[in-house]
């Protein structure tokens, strides 16, 4: 594959030991907790003595330990090797709580038999920076992927959208002229065409449009934008 984009937190060990480079942060996730509404729990601070399903080999294990110890609460960990095993155990009632990154909790909630019977609690107990990864050793491709992400973020800041991209390309504003390649040729430094930013926005939209379509208000997940 050319690009790996998934919920693998950017950590020092992953960045230095896997032969991969993180190209930037495209999404700030964070660990949360999902629980059945029938248990009438409104806050993670009410989870003292709860049993918690967690996937091994993730940052979730250590984060859970730190959070409960820091709040002087007891808990029981029930660990599983894969995400599917963890979710199935939670759904079958083997534990009170399922903990993972909030984005995964929303996604897994859609798969359970009765999604409306489960709630993601408001507390986010960690910061999990996520972003596209590429292989070591191909610096040009690393630059292309990195600056594609930056271009999507910059397009949103400048008000460039899929609908208005052609009109915005006619602007006399210096920053827009540079972005669209009508003043200079930044794309050439990446091995791309002058209109590389326009092509990106036309294909997938700016960062906000992509967020809304895939995980935000325009998706089944309905995750709030946050940062």
Question: Where in the sequence are the language-model features?
Answer:
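Extracytoplasmic low-complexity repetitive segments enriched in small/polar residues
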Residues: 12, 93-95, 156, 200
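Extracellular/periplasmic bilobed ligand-binding domains
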Residues: 81-117, 132
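Alpha-to-beta junction loops
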Residues: 1-7, 50-53, 91-100
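Bilobed "Venus flytrap"/periplasmic-binding protein-like clamshell domains
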Residues: 9-10, 28-85, 139
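Conserved C-terminal helix/tail region of periplasmic/extracytoplasmic solute-binding proteins
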Residues: 213-227
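Extended ligand-binding regions for polar small-molecule ligands
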Residues: 35-41, 45, 49-59, 104-105, ...
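Acidic, polar ligand-binding/catalytic clefts
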Residues: 1-46, 102-126
């Amino acid at each position: 594959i050319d690009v790996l984009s998934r919920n693998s937190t950017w950590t020092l060990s992953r960045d230095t030991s896997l032969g991969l480079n993180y190209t930037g942060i495209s999404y700030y996730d964070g660990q949360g907790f999902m629980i059945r509404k029938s248990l009438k729990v409104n806050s993670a601070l009410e989870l003292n003595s709860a049993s918690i399903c967690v996937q091994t080999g993730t940052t979730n294990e250590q984060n859970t330990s730190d959070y409960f110890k820091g709040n002087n609460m007891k808990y029981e960990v029930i660990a599983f090797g894969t995400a599917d095993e963890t979710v199935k155990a939670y759904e079958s009632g083997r534990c009170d709580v399922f903990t993972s990154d909030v984005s995964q909790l929303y996604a897994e909630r859609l798969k359970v038999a009765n999604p409306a019977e489960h709630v993601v609690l408001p507390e986010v107990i960690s910061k999990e920076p996520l972003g596209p990864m590429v292989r070591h050793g191909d610096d040009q491709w690393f630059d292309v992927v990195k600056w594609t992400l930056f271009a999507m973020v910059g397009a949103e800041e400048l008000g460039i959208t899929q609908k208005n991209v052609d009109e915005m390309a006619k602007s006399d504003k210096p920053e827009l002229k540079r972005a669209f390649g009508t003043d200079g040729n930044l794309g050439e430094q990446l091995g791309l065409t002058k209109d590389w930013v326009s092509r990106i926005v036309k294909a997938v939209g700016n960062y906000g449009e992509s967020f809304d379509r895939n995980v935000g208000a325009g998706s089944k997940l309905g995750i709030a934008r946050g940062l």
